[in-house]
Swiss-Prot record:
GO cellular component, one term: cytoplasm
Entry protein name: Small ribosomal subunit protein uS14
Species of provenance: Xanthobacter autotrophicus (strain ATCC BAA-1158 / Py2)
Keywords: Ribonucleoprotein, Ribosomal protein, RNA-binding, rRNA-binding
PROSITE patterns according to UniProt: RIBOSOMAL_S14
Basic and acidic residues bias spans: 1-11
This protein's record includes keyword Ribosomal protein: yes
InterPro entries cross-referenced by the UniProt entry: Ribosomal_uS14 (IPR001209), Ribosomal_uS14_bac/plastid (IPR023036), Ribosomal_uS14_CS (IPR018271)
Subunit-level organization: Part of the 30S ribosomal subunit. Contacts proteins S3 and S10.
BP GO annotations: translation
GO molecular function, one term: rRNA binding
Length: 101
């Protein structure tokens, strides 16, 4: 089980990122638009730098919904390999059957 503080920090980052996503995308579009004057693009860069760092999508870490484990994460199921194995053995994951040949 991951530390509660790490899980909570990641959740805070997730909320911040969703809240600032539209404004961040608008500013990035201005910065990358080569037809605009350099001064306007520079002002957009400064505004982007003033925004909270944890509001960036890149700062979010994929974590297991069950255990909070950050590694060996399956995006489709939103859980780690260990949690997947445990829940799969209990028959809690629909469509997952133990392999036998």
């Amino acid at each position: 089980m991951a530390k509660k503080s790490a899980i909570e920090t990641n959740e805070r980052r997730r909320k911040l990122a969703t809240g600032h996503a539209a404004k961040r995308a608008r500013l990035k579009a201005i910065v990358n638009d080569k037809t605009l004057p350099i001064e306007e693009r520079f002002q957009a860069t400064l505004k982007l730098a003033e925004m909270p760092r944890n509001g960036a999508k890149i700062r979010i870490r994929n974590r297991c919904e069950v255990t909070g484990r950050p590694r060996a994460f399956y995006r489709k199921l939103k859980m780690s390999r260990i949690a997947l194995r445990e829940l799969g053995n209990q028959g809690m994951v629909p469509g997952l059957v133990k392999s036998s040949w």
